[in-house]
Amino acid sequence: MRKYIYFIALICCALSASTSYAQKKVIKTMMIAGQDGSHYWRGACEAMKQILENSGMFKVDFVFTPDFGGDINTFKPDFAKYNLVVVNYGGEVWPEPVQKAFENYVADGGGVVIIHSSVVPMAGWKAYN
Protein backbone atom coordinates (compact mmCIF):
# COMPACT_ATOMS: atom_id res chain seq x y z
CA MET A 1 0.00 0.00 0.00
CA ARG A 2 2.83 2.40 0.83
CA LYS A 3 4.32 1.82 -2.61
CA TYR A 4 1.08 3.05 -4.18
CA ILE A 5 0.99 6.13 -1.97
CA TYR A 6 4.59 6.98 -2.85
CA PHE A 7 3.86 6.37 -6.53
CA ILE A 8 0.80 8.65 -6.46
CA ALA A 9 2.77 11.30 -4.56
CA LEU A 10 5.54 11.10 -7.17
CA ILE A 11 3.05 11.52 -10.02
CA CYS A 12 1.44 14.50 -8.27
CA CYS A 13 4.83 16.15 -7.81
CA ALA A 14 5.74 15.57 -11.44
CA LEU A 15 2.43 16.99 -12.67
CA SER A 16 2.75 19.96 -10.35
CA ALA A 17 6.27 20.72 -11.58
CA SER A 18 5.33 20.41 -15.26
CA THR A 19 2.25 22.60 -14.80
CA SER A 20 4.20 25.37 -13.07
CA TYR A 21 6.91 25.17 -15.75
CA ALA A 22 4.32 25.45 -18.53
CA GLN A 23 2.72 28.44 -16.84
CA LYS A 24 6.03 30.28 -16.75
CA LYS A 25 6.59 29.78 -20.47
CA VAL A 26 4.22 32.51 -21.70
CA ILE A 27 4.22 33.56 -25.35
CA LYS A 28 4.69 37.32 -25.49
CA THR A 29 2.31 38.51 -28.19
CA MET A 30 1.97 41.83 -30.01
CA MET A 31 -1.42 42.41 -31.63
CA ILE A 32 -1.31 45.11 -34.31
CA ALA A 33 -4.54 46.83 -35.28
CA GLY A 34 -6.04 50.16 -36.27
CA GLN A 35 -7.29 52.08 -39.30
CA ASP A 36 -9.80 49.44 -40.39
CA GLY A 37 -12.97 51.04 -41.67
CA SER A 38 -14.67 47.79 -42.67
CA HIS A 39 -14.50 45.80 -39.42
CA TYR A 40 -15.11 46.34 -35.72
CA TRP A 41 -11.44 45.74 -35.01
CA ARG A 42 -11.42 47.00 -31.43
CA GLY A 43 -13.98 44.42 -30.35
CA ALA A 44 -12.28 41.69 -32.36
CA CYS A 45 -8.93 42.50 -30.74
CA GLU A 46 -10.40 42.45 -27.24
CA ALA A 47 -12.08 39.09 -27.93
CA MET A 48 -8.89 37.55 -29.34
CA LYS A 49 -6.85 38.87 -26.42
CA GLN A 50 -9.30 37.39 -23.93
CA ILE A 51 -9.26 34.01 -25.66
CA LEU A 52 -5.46 33.90 -25.88
CA GLU A 53 -4.80 35.10 -22.34
CA ASN A 54 -7.47 32.84 -20.84
CA SER A 55 -5.50 29.88 -22.17
CA GLY A 56 -2.68 30.85 -19.82
CA MET A 57 -0.20 30.54 -22.68
CA PHE A 58 -0.15 34.13 -23.98
CA LYS A 59 0.41 37.68 -22.76
CA VAL A 60 -1.02 40.07 -25.34
CA ASP A 61 -0.08 43.73 -25.82
CA PHE A 62 -1.93 45.94 -28.29
CA VAL A 63 -0.03 48.14 -30.70
CA PHE A 64 -2.27 50.50 -32.66
CA THR A 65 -1.44 52.49 -35.75
CA PRO A 66 -2.43 56.15 -35.90
CA ASP A 67 -6.07 56.76 -36.84
CA PHE A 68 -6.97 57.45 -40.48
CA GLY A 69 -5.54 60.84 -41.39
CA GLY A 70 -2.74 60.47 -38.83
CA ASP A 71 0.91 60.10 -39.76
CA ILE A 72 1.58 56.40 -40.41
CA ASN A 73 5.31 57.17 -40.18
CA THR A 74 4.91 57.48 -36.40
CA PHE A 75 4.04 53.77 -36.28
CA LYS A 76 7.24 52.07 -35.08
CA PRO A 77 6.50 48.77 -33.31
CA ASP A 78 9.35 46.95 -31.55
CA PHE A 79 8.92 43.44 -32.91
CA ALA A 80 12.00 42.11 -31.09
CA LYS A 81 10.19 42.22 -27.72
CA TYR A 82 7.72 39.55 -28.82
CA ASN A 83 7.57 35.85 -29.69
CA LEU A 84 4.43 36.30 -31.78
CA VAL A 85 2.86 39.10 -33.82
CA VAL A 86 -0.86 38.93 -34.60
CA VAL A 87 -1.85 41.31 -37.42
CA ASN A 88 -5.50 42.41 -37.39
CA TYR A 89 -5.12 45.47 -39.56
CA GLY A 90 -6.75 46.95 -42.64
CA GLY A 91 -5.34 50.45 -43.08
CA GLU A 92 -2.44 52.16 -44.83
CA VAL A 93 0.63 50.24 -45.91
CA TRP A 94 3.28 50.27 -43.18
CA PRO A 95 6.28 52.55 -43.73
CA GLU A 96 9.33 50.99 -45.40
CA PRO A 97 11.41 50.83 -42.17
CA VAL A 98 8.58 48.96 -40.41
CA GLN A 99 8.27 46.55 -43.34
CA LYS A 100 12.00 45.80 -43.19
CA ALA A 101 11.91 45.37 -39.40
CA PHE A 102 8.97 42.97 -39.76
CA GLU A 103 10.75 40.97 -42.47
CA ASN A 104 13.84 40.72 -40.25
CA TYR A 105 11.70 39.64 -37.29
CA VAL A 106 10.20 36.81 -39.34
CA ALA A 107 13.58 35.84 -40.83
CA ASP A 108 14.94 35.58 -37.28
CA GLY A 109 12.19 33.11 -36.34
CA GLY A 110 9.45 35.40 -35.03
CA GLY A 111 5.94 33.97 -35.15
CA VAL A 112 3.18 35.61 -37.19
CA VAL A 113 -0.59 35.21 -37.47
CA ILE A 114 -2.40 37.22 -40.15
CA ILE A 115 -6.10 37.72 -39.43
CA HIS A 116 -8.69 37.82 -42.20
CA SER A 117 -8.39 40.90 -44.43
CA SER A 118 -5.01 41.98 -43.07
CA VAL A 119 -3.50 40.92 -46.39
CA VAL A 120 -5.49 43.54 -48.34
CA PRO A 121 -3.52 46.71 -47.49
CA MET A 122 -0.22 44.92 -48.04
CA ALA A 123 -1.04 43.64 -51.54
CA GLY A 124 2.06 45.25 -53.06
CA TRP A 125 4.43 43.95 -50.37
CA LYS A 126 5.84 40.74 -51.82
CA ALA A 127 7.55 39.46 -48.66
CA TYR A 128 4.37 39.94 -46.61
CA ASN A 129 2.26 37.99 -49.07
What are these regions (language model features)?
Residues L84-N88:
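Structural motif
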Residues I8, Y89, V119:
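Residues that line or immediately flank small-molecule/substrate-binding pockets and catalytic motifs
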Residues I32, E92-N129:
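A glycine-rich, often tryptophan-bearing local segment used as a flexible ligand/cofactor-contacting loop or short
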Residues G37, G91-E92:
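Short, acidic/glycine-rich phosphate-metal binding loop used to engage nucleotide
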Residues M1-K24:
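Bacterial Sec-dependent N-terminal signal peptides
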Residues A22-K81:
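Aromatic-Pro/Gly-enriched surface loop or interdomain linker
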